[in-house]
Amino acid sequence: MATKTMTAQELTDLRLGTLDTAVTDWETMSKRLKTLSTGEGGGVNAQRLRAEATAADWSGVNAGVTRDFVTKTAAEFQDVAGQATSVLGILRDAGAAFKRHKADLRTVIDDVAKRNIYINAKGGAVASVPSGAAAGSGDIPTPSDEELAVAESRVKRVLREASETDRIAARALRALARNKHDFTGDGPGGIKEADDRQGKADADYWARRVKESDPSEWSAEEIERFNETLIAQRDNPGFSERFATTLGADGTLQFWRDIADPGQGKTPEGERAKILGRLQQNLSMSLATASHVDSPAMDTWKREIIASGGKQFGHEGIMVKPYGFQIMSNLMVKGKFDSGFLDDYGSAIRTFEQSKGSQFNPAAVWGNPGIAAKLDYTGEGGTPGSDPMAGYLKAVSHNPDFATDLFLKRLPDDSDDPNAPTRTMADYLLSEREFYDEDDPFGEGDGTMQSRDALGKALLAAGTGLNPDVPAVVTDYDRTPEQREVLDKSLGLLAGKKDDFPPELRDDMAALLANHGDKVHQSASSLNSGDSALDYKDLLQVSKQVSRDQDAYGLLMEGVNQAIIADMHAPHEGDPKEELLRAGQTVGFMESARYHALDTDKDDPSWPAKWAYHGAGGVVNFVPVVGDALQRGVDAGAYAWQMEEQARIDDELAIDKSQNFQSRQAYLTALGEEWSRVNPGHKLSADGDEYLRQMDISLAALNGNKSANGTVGSS
């Protein structure tokens, strides 16, 4: 059943004239057959013939046979007319859909071309910037990796939708033409109905296979066929609801428990583990689609999934029995689940954990060897997937609006103190709940806590409104009050951890700060820490903790650099010298955070290897890119900063302890030059006054550095 995805070239070259002709021909055919069937317009017709044959007084040896033949023939005329109507509906809908797909692709191609992006024949996005000679004196920006990824994602979406139209139409037409001597009058009326029927038929088939066989014995080929069905039907509610509700809540959980880890030395590995990883993700997406269906059957399924969270599910012949929460959370790793379901499910996990007592230890419950089945195959080699909070938080990160609501959700007041501060889920997740290394629940493991890594992605989604797993290009600093509140709340909670700041959250917190770079810059450059947009002490402490990881620090500085340049280009009242001084002040602040991070870890034996600079990586798509006019200054500043950072690394991270900003003189110079480019008429931009400009921005950096150092010393 493997289906080929259409290429950009194939969709572009698709000629719809023949299809339009077929629609016209079938319109004529359908009208004629309908006339013969019902007699519209008068004349001989099957409906009249059937009525007369039924009412007639037949006699003779073959009377019964003849009556049946005539009435059956008359009925078949009606079926033929109905089938013709179905064919017409499929062809008409397909034609309209393909025209829409072609127009959508053309729109995307034309749109991304404005960003100097070319879409190749296969649908890939590549930079298309003319050479220096061809460009002349024009300053043509090269598209970023994030812009290329977004462009390619847009094209793939169109191609996937076009391929789905092709698949659904072809399957429906084949079904209608299956028997040349028999006709059906109840065919689908169009593409949408055909999609629904096909989805339900596939769901019935696979639900029956699950019930009538042992999924742990399925061959790799059969699992891959199921994968292909899940991919084809991933956004089809007809399939997803039917499959989930036919299996039922317990049946769904038991299926994954059986196929994921049958035990007895049969725990999947190698190629089968990879196939199961794909199945886990595809089934997650299908269940996510189902969660949005508003029907009594689906409501029952969701309630029963939650009710079964505290049940244990075994497998024949083995003692290991994981909880329903553990199984279901591993089927929530992909797709956007319904917000109401996520809220109810997350509350149920927390209630279950609380029922284990005030001294609840997640590792002792979820990591217990007696329930330690292998349920997660999404990572390299997979992880046990024992902490249900990991899969749940992945699902939260894929629904950013819900993520924001979750982190700000108030918890019941169980304190006797009337003045006790209001607790939220942010308090619970970032400060109260314990996490553990699923690979080694009762040992040291590799030091990475998978569920806390998922927590970082959920926090990032909550504070930015973006899905961390979807390419994006952010072009402004417009954030909702709720997203700002998530940032404020998380800053306070994580700053309180000081050097116990979770390493898994460094890159995500760096991305969150970069996404709110305007507020970070305003706060870091504040003359009065009490008036800063963000809490000055909290920002400094979190910036320090983020800076303990080279890549996270690089990402943070990408965001700060963008924000500084954007501030220089933004309209302001008063002397623009303020933006020059603020730039220096922020650089001094960030260098203080960086120095204290280095000083904290200087005795770590793994310290030298830890700091090789690799760049900020894929999460740069959270950094706002505010207009092409800024890009030259952004690039110049980033280049100067990176060169100085590399030199610092080569010099074993040497830094002037008293004046940390001194290692940033080239960066300060680049910022000063960009400021003069924006303000050519200012006296500090006059020829010969470069020294004065450099002195001003350097003194501002010194002031920012001293203020930050003093704050660190007092905390």
Each language-model region and where it sits:
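Non-catalytic all-alpha helical scaffold/repeat segments
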Residues: D186-V712
